[in-house]
Amino acid sequence: GVVPYEMDKDWPLAALEAQAVCARTYAVKTRHPSLGFDVCAGTDCQVYYGRNRATDMTDAAVDNTAGEMIYYGGKPADTVVYCASNGGATEDAANVWSSIPYLVGKKDPYEVKTNIPNYNWSVTYTADELTWILEQKGYSIGTVKNVYVAEFTPMGNVSKVTFEGSRDSVTVKGETCRTIFYSSTYNKSVKSQRFTINGAGAASGGIYINDSNTVIRSLEGISVLSGGGKTVRLDGSASVLSASETSTVGEGQTPAFSKDGTFTITGSGSGHNLGMSQYGANGMAKEGNTYREILQHYYAGTAVG
């Protein structure tokens, strides 16, 4: 009953099989022991509404993979999460929750935009709405004056968002960059970790230095080796030669400074960007990949057995 509610029942068998193995592995990890049960029937765990939507294909996916789970280090993987769509790249769990070795960031060429409903999305907030939302979540920074992405990951997803208010400022990290915008009162939310604010700066903005984790956006006080072999200090932007192109360091997401009191967030994908993309699994299956290949692509270093 889980598979046809979590994934389109008419998708290729390999995608449905991958979903079945994910669901089975997920079920062995309890999420709600304090409430007296293991897993719930909603999107917080796995959607289950009985067998009404089951088909021969979804039943075959379950039967073909009977007893199989995803293993890491010889044990069932305890964080087999997935999302509807990653918007173009998965993310390292360390940049969203905490480090999980088999949940790593990688570009995803298998998601086909034209086949994904609401792949690209946008939502607009007023300064008053954001001020109220932040206050409800314990952040009293005064009237919101500015909001911007403070840091992107190497995959182009958001890892830090800064809110500047009339009294103070606050920077949130990880999954909070997405969830902090949720409001049932205003019926608004940010759908994924992959977005920009007011279109100021692309998700790929900035240059990653040395370890591919540190992004440089301001060059003031930075020392570099010039083409002439001299060490010089910079105070503005500069062009550098990367492995693939000439890029300008110092051009990242800049503060939005909304003139009309609104902030528009534009992004792609849906979910936390971790683990298997369900639409990506669909794309891989259509290209002839098996469910084992799909799972090993999205869960690095794991085995199915």
Which functions belong to the PLM regions below?
Residues 1-305:
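Conserved, single-site charged/polar hotspot
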